[in-house]
């Protein structure tokens, strides 16, 4: 019987405001982290943290994550199309503000994102999302911890070792 790979956290890192929080939570739970960016990004030196410079293509970092993510992994991204791809692959996906993306919500989220993009490009709406707040940071930490615990409960326990 093969053992399930440990949960890995993938970070869409180019504009992620909660990288430091992810590193701390991952270390506490002993989970590996892949920090994926389009180019070089500074990360702490730690055996659980892997830095990936995916290349300068428009969606290089997104493609790198989407091609590797598996059920039971966690992806942190504000990129709705990437979130959609990862949800379809069976991953748990969180926005940096702690909002989870799910199979039930991703279709509507993607439709709203596309509508807002069209409205912005036509000049109907100017500006972008509100700024990131300490409340968002706290909500993210709570959501990440809850997600890790939920995944751990779903994974089968390792077989008991025979006593000698």
Swiss-Prot record:
Domain of life, per lineage: Bacteria
One of the Pfam families matching this protein, by short name: DUF188
Annotated InterPro entries: UPF0178
Family, similarity comment: Belongs to the UPF0178 family.
Identification of the protein by name: UPF0178 protein RPB_3201
Lineage: Bacteria, Pseudomonadati, Pseudomonadota, Alphaproteobacteria, Hyphomicrobiales
């Amino acid at each position: 019987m093969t053992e399930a790979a440990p949960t890995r956290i993938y970070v869409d890192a180019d504009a992620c405001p909660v990288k430091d929080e992810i590193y701390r939570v991952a270390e506490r739970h002993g989970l590996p982290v892949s920090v994926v960016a389009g180019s070089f990004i500074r990360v702490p030196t730690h055996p659980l943290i892997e830095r990936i410079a995916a290349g300068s293509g428009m969606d290089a970092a997104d493609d790198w994550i989407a091609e590797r993510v598996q059920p039971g992994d966690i992806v942190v991204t504000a990129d709705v199309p990437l979130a959609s791809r990862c949800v379809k692959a069976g991953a748990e996906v969180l926005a940096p503000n702690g909002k989870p993306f799910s199979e039930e919500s991703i279709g509507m989220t993607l439709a709203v994102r596309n509508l807002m993009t069209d409205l912005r490009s036509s000049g109907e709406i100017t500006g972008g999302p509100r700024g990131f707040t300490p409340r968002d940071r706290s909500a993210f930490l709570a959501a990440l911890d809850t997600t890790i615990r939920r995944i751990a409960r779903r994974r089968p326990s390792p077989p008991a070792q025979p006593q000698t």
